[in-house]
Amino acid sequence: MNARPITDADIEAVAAMAAEDEAALQGRPSRLGANDVRDWLARVDLAQDSWLYEEDGTLVAMSWFDFIDDLGFFAGIVAQGAKGRGLGSRIVATGDARARERGAARVQTFGLEQDTAAASLFERHGFAFVRRFFAMAIELEAPPVVPALPDAFTLETFRLEDARPYYEALDAAFQDHWEHHTVGFEQWWEAKQAVHDFDPTLWFLIRDGDEIAAVIRNDPDRNGGGYVGAIGVQRAWRGKGLGRALLLRTFAEFYSRGVPRVTLGVDAESPTGATKLYESVGMTTENAGVVYEKALA
């Protein structure tokens, strides 16, 4: 069996394999596409930390590894027709070894909640459940009404000159988020501009005077529709309806572009009550994913 790094030319095939696997697990068609795979691999050094497994020229599995601070993370997919042949164990062993090489104190991986075979595999290799995340979505049937804000607040579209204060507001809002890692403005901004379909006309913010109180960052095409990549309200401004206003502004923008479907991912145990907010604007849970962790120190 041949293993080699993933290249841009492989993205469509990997997306098709991932969609087939997800559909089999959740019992309905998957909306995963090439842009979702590009997001998974956005921070990955493909030459060093990605693996595409082929047998007689046929794609049978893929995996990748990422590292930040003291944390290693890997994930992978085995094609439906190649399960039960040890590829999952090979992916886990490769991710574990790569994390140790990088000096990680711990390593995490991820699987859909329905994937009991993956859960058993991870547990056999010393991983334990640590967190659950929900994938939520809304299918808009009419343009949403964006609520008026109190006089002190203004809702605006992002401008390039807003980049640094926008980042600072987002980073501050995410201090409550599980496993948040501050990467610094330059690294964050470079990464965002490098996204192949970077579209800051889909980013919005709310000001309170000269201060940015809340922000939302959206991507045009993920999981079969528009995607909320991040939304954050700084602590001092929570409970004022700012998150709701940003979501409805986002929905209205996507609807005006002919995109009625919008999705996002959320920590099921978010201390800010994010799940309730998303439900209040009409979003429902489509599936759940589970993060597993293993200590290496």
Where are these predicted regions, by residue range?
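Short amphipathic alpha-helix that is part of the acyltransferase structural core
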Residues: 1-39, 148-181
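N-terminal charged segments
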Residues: 4-75, 96
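A conserved beta-strand-loop-helix scaffold within acyl/acetyltransferase catalytic domains
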Residues: 26-49, 63-70, 177-233
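A short, internal acetyl-CoA/4′-phosphopantetheine-binding micro-motif in the GNAT/acyltransferase core
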Residues: 52, 75-85, 231-238, 268
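Acyl-donor-binding surface of acyltransferase catalytic domains
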Residues: 66-73, 78-152, 290-294
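Conserved acetyl-CoA-binding loop-helix of GNAT-fold acetyltransferases
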Residues: 84-97, 230-233, 239-256, 275-280
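Active-site/acyl-donor-binding loops of N-acyltransferases
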Residues: 124-144, 248, 257-297
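Active-site proximal loops enriched in glycine and acidic residues that flank catalytic Cys/His/Asp
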Residues: 208, 216-222, 230-235, 251, ...
